[in-house]
From Swiss-Prot:
Expressed in the hypodermis, in the vulva during organogenesis, and in the ray papillae of the male tail. Disruption phenotype: RNAi-mediated knockdown results in the extension of mean and maximum lifespan of 21% and 18%, respectively, and increased resistance to oxidative stress caused by paraquat. RNAi-mediated knockdown in a daf-16 mutant background shortens mean and maximum lifespan by 3% and 2%, respectively. RNAi-mediated knockdown in a let-7 mutant background partially suppresses the retarded and supernumerary hypodermal seam cell divisions, retarded alae production and postembryonic lethality. It holds the Pfam family Peptidase_M2. Keywords: Developmental protein, Disulfide bond, Glycoprotein, Signal. Disulfide bonds join 289-297. Glycans are attached at residues 159, 653. Inactive as a metallopeptidase, due to a lack of active site residues. Required for larval molting, male tail development, and formation of adult alae. Acts in the heterochronic pathway and plays a role in the developmental timing of postembryonic hypodermal seam cell division and adult alae production. Acts synergistically with apl-1 in let-7 regulated postembryonic cell division events. Might act downstream of the heterochronic protein lin-41. The lineage of its organism: Eukaryota, Metazoa, Ecdysozoa, Nematoda, Chromadorea. Belongs to the peptidase M2 family. Residues 67-83 have a biased composition (Basic and acidic residues). Residues 175-765 form the Peptidase M2 domain. This is Inactive angiotensin-converting enzyme-related protein. Residues 863-882 have a biased composition (Low complexity).
Length: 906
């Protein structure tokens, strides 16, 4: 009721102001008729007396003496206007995109299609209606004469040629005629492309409309492919590889004859699949109880991520970690079974054990060829190169964890870190602690600037890809077919159940049919992803003229490295400025922003590298059989401590298998060092693409000349090894971690200096000395950072205190003491609240009375404010909150005072 009465009174107060008559100003006398001395109009010694009768003698007309003429003053020369300072010219963009030829991206057809309703698959409905109309029932009366397939096109390929037959095969290696081999390979290519095309189409349909029927169709297509691979591999083994003289023909034969785990007998392959399914099921469905919570237990692995990311009670995290590894210990027999069956499959492919078969993807060994280099030695060399950097990062984080978790039991200043303290269940990603441990407060403003540019320039997700495409064309890459733009999916279609993750660049196994599947959103992350996916598409497009068996990447590690290098290049400030996505102010990046960026990336990616080495070395020992069955868990932690400086949160439990907590061990049965190798290659390729002297952490601008070697390498596809591809791109055909260290150099220097100043112990082979109270750093509170909103005590509003680092909101910033409005805004004070507004309503008569409603309006750009009784802040400021400027008293402001009295009296 008070509010409604106040509102009515306020409206009543405003009406007289806005409806009053505007009176014309009195006309001024000419300059030569105006009296020079206003007091001369009155007689000396006879004061002017105000009366009601204007014709009284006292107020009678008084003669005014004629003024003496004065000489006309010489006209003053007109002042010359001050020349306006010329604006600072904007820097020239590094890339002239106006010179890039525009193309038809299918936007017209896309716009027309967007106005139509989504297509519906009415085939099933029509069949049911026809059946009902003809029979009066929806039950079919047809007699099934054979199996009904979800993918009849794929099924029709089975046994459609001799390449599906495995009867009457000759003995392995018995055919030594190379011409027969060439003829067989030509026929193989013609048959294989049909199968691969159907698998690609089935996958595309399912990923973009994940219905049960389309999933069944994809499964059938993949089963057909498995049958084809098995039969052709058996046929290929008839040829003697040692008799082949042509290196390319030999490489093709090697690709076809390799079966992998498909070489197992069907029953044994089924055992392998069942063991995998059991691992997946146990990992997902195992339940545990929270600390001090009695059964029934309901927490699953999916619930752990948020708990470990936000919980700061180390004892609770230890309880959850120990409970979960104990719960999944039942998977230990299944994992041992996978190791055994993997060894069997490796021997069928000509390898000593599963570890040797895994390494063959990198060392190029085969049944008839020895490894080209010792992969384990190369990995150890990489580790010795990056170990000093990792130890600096490890030491810095270890000290910070003492502050975050209040010096928890088991954490020392010179020993390994307990695995449950990294902010995730498996401890693989340290980035959960970024906000509380980052070196500096300043963050890059590029993401916000880019998002603003996207919105201002009416970007769509497709336009992000078009923008990236124009960048590639400026760097010498060729035109892509129009079908790429008309067939690809760049954004999620919400009327369908799409498989969005992961985004993928797809070779559809048909001439000029290349597509991308991405549920992209406007923003910096997906802008980077657009460049990553496009360079993968270009890899596929450039090797399209190779024979089918060479129409692949040289290695997945090469593709990953190239894709990640281009994602980084897309963040170069000069490139973004050329694309009109950031203003020129972003061309100069502060060192603090660069160090923060590198620190965050190191927590997300670099810290995983030692783990990949530990995980693979442990599994290689399992494949070799060198570790006793009752020592598997002990050995796991010994290796992790050696490479990572990480220890178990509890004493070793021989009945457990703690490694199964990691998806990269329990779910992915392939070398984890693929991550390490591709990450190292990323920086080798980045350094090769950029000019000499480039600061790798900032990237560079590419040109047609700098990408020439890369494009030539891509054209060769898998006809060359990944080491040869690396040599063609970088000039060096071996792994080298020095470019990685060069990239992280600003962060490495900062970590080294910070650890020295804080006297932090580097390494983890100490005696387990605990932190003293003085050594524990003061970290930000849990609500300070993270990816969510800051807590209430970490924000302040205009006029509020910000002395403790609070974030100023609502168009204000901290002047060291309080939050003041940004330049160009006005401060509107209503009661004890301040608001930053763009206009100046003071012209309407608002003032700052003494009542409960106080309205003061003043421009933050005032340079000569009136004196104020309030003391000025002593802290150094850039923009002061100006003192109140008292407005002239008006009937309206008096009415507001009366209004306030009435309001509080109600």
């Amino acid at each position: 009721m008070k509010f409604h009465i106040l509102l009515l009174l306020l409206v009543g107060a405003c009406l007289p102001v806005f409806t009053q008559e505007i009176k014309p100003k009195p006309e001024l006398l000419p300059a030569d008729e105006a009296p020079k001395d206003p007091e001369a109009v009155f007689s000396e010694g006879e004061p002017f007396e105000l009366t009601d009768a204007l014709d009284t003698p006292k107020n009678g007309s008084v003669p005014v003496p004629e003024p003496e003429p004065k000489p006309e003053p010489e006209p003053e020369p007109e002042p010359k206007p001050e020349p306006e300072p010329s604006p600072t010219p904007e820097p020239e963009p590094a890339i002239k995109f106006d010179n890039i030829e525009s193309e038809d991206y299918g936007d017209v057809a896309e716009t027309a299609a967007s106005t139509q309703p989504d297509e519906l698959n009415t085939e099933v409905i029509e069949q049911l209606v026809d059946t009902f109309l003809n029979t009066g029932s929806i039950a079919s009366n047809k007699t099934n004469k054979g199996p009904v397939f979800a993918n009849p096109v794929a099924q029709a390929l089975v046994n459609s040629s001799n390449y599906w037959k495995t009867d009457n095969l000759q003995a392995p290696g018995s055919i030594k005629d190379e011409e027969k081999l060439r003829s067989w390979l030509a026929g193989y290519e013609a048959e294989a492309i049909k199968v691969l095309r159907e698998v690609a189409l089935s996958g595309w349909r399912y990923f973009n409309d994940a219905s049960p029927s389309l999933k069944l169709a994809l499964d059938e297509a993949e089963n057909v492919l498995t049958m084809f691979v098995r039969s052709t591999s058996m046929q290929a083994k008839q040829f003697d590889m040692a008799s082949v003289t042509d290196e390319k023909v030999m490489r093709q034969l090697g690709y076809v004859s390799f079966e992998g785990m498909s070489a197992l007998a069907p029953s044994r392959f089924a055992d392998y699949s069942q063991a995998q399914a059991a691992l997946n099921r146990d990992s997902k469905d195992s339940t545990i109880c929270d600390k001090d919570v009695p059964p029934p237990c309901a927490l699953q692995k999916i619930d752990m991520d948020s708990i470990f990311r936000n919980e700061k009670d180390a004892s609770r995290l230890q309880h959850l970690w120990v409970s979960y590894v104990t719960a999944i210990a039942k998977s230990k027999p299944s994992y041992n079974n996978i190791i055994t069956i993997s060894n069997e499959g490796a021997k069928l492919n000509g390898f000593a054990n599963g570890g040797a078969m895994w390494r063959s993807a990198f060392d190029m060994s085969s049944k008839v060829h020895k490894a080209e280099f010792d992969l384990n030695k190369q990995i150890d060399k990489i580790y010795s190169t990056i170990q000093p950097f990792y130890q600096l990062l490890h030491a810095y984080m270890r000290r910070q964890l003492a502050g975050i978790y209040s010096n928890p039991v088991g954490l020392s200043k010179d020993g390994p870190i307990p695995a449950h303290l990294f902010g995730s269940l498996d401890g693989g990603d340290w980035s959960a602690h970024y906000e509380q441990t980052k070196p500096f407060e300043e963050e890059s403003e590029t993401p916000e600037a880019m998002l603003s540019a996207f919105n201002t320039q009416n970007y769509t997700t497709k336009k992000m890809f078009v923008t990236a495409y124009r960048y590639f064309k400026s760097a010498g890459f060729p035109h892509l077919p129009k079908s790429y733009w008309t067939s690809s999916i760049f954004a999620r279609v919400w009327s369908k159940d799409m498989i969005c993750h992961p985004a993928a660049a797809l070779d559809m196994r048909a001439p000029n049919d290349f597509r991308v599947k991405a549920c992209a959103q406007l923003g910096e992350p997906d802008f980077e992803q657009a460049h990553s996916l496009l360079v993968q598409t270009y890899y596929q497009y450039l090797y399209k003229d190779q024979s089918l068996l060479f129409r692949e990447q040289a290695s997945p590690v090469i593709t990953d490295a190239i894709a990640n290098a281009f994602a980084h290049l897309s963040t170069n400030p000069h490139y973004l400025y050329s694309q009109k996505l950031v203003p020129s102010e972003h061309l100069d990046i502060k060192d603090s922003v660069i160090i923060n960026k590198l620190y965050k990336e190191s927590l997300e990616s670099f810290t995983k590298l030692p783990f990949t080495i530990a995980a693979d070395n442990w599994r290689y020992e399992l494949f070799d059989g060198t570790v006793p069955k009752n020592k598997l868990n002990d050995r796991w932690w010994e290796i992790r401590n050696k490479y990572e400086g990480v220890r178990s949160p509890q004493p070793y439990n021989t009945s457990n298998l703690d490694a199964l907590i990691h998806n990269s061990v329990s779910q992915v049965h392939s070398p984890a060092t693929r991550t390490l190798i591709s990450y190292v290659l990323k920086f080798q390729i980045l350094k090769a693409l950029c000019p000499e002297g480039t600061i790798l952490s900032e990237g560079c601008i590419l040109s047609e000349d700098t990408t020439e070697k890369l494009r030539e390498t891509m054209k060769l596809g898998s006809s060359i090894t990944w080491l040869k591809a690396l040599e063609m791109i970088s000039g060096k055909g071996e792994l080298d971690a020095q470019p990685l260290l060069e990239y992280y150099e600003p962060l490495i220097n900062w970590l080294r200096n910070t650890n020295e100043i804080d006297q932090v112990v580097v390494g983890w082979d100490g005696e387990g000395t605990p932190f003293t109270v003085e050594e524990i750093p003061k970290t930000r509170q849990p609500g300070d950072g993270g990816n969510g909103l800051p807590s209430e005590d970490r924000v302040a509003f205009p006029g509020g205190e910000c002395v403790n680092g609070q974030e100023c909101l609502l168009d204000s910033h901290c002047n060291g003491t309080i939050c003041v409005c940004n330049d160009g805004l006005y401060t509107l004070e209503i009661g004890n609240t301040f608001n930053c507004v763009p206009g100046n309503p003071a012209d309407s008569g608002f003032g700052d009375g003494k009542g409960g409603l106080v309205i003061g309006l003043f421009n933050n750009e005032v340079t000569t404010p009136e004196p104020s009784a309030e003391p000025e802040p002593t802290a150094k400021t850039t923009t002061k909150m100006p003192p109140r400027v008292r407005a002239a008293t008006s009937p309206f402001s008096l009415y507001l005072t009366v209004l306030l009295i009435i309001y509080f009296a109600l």
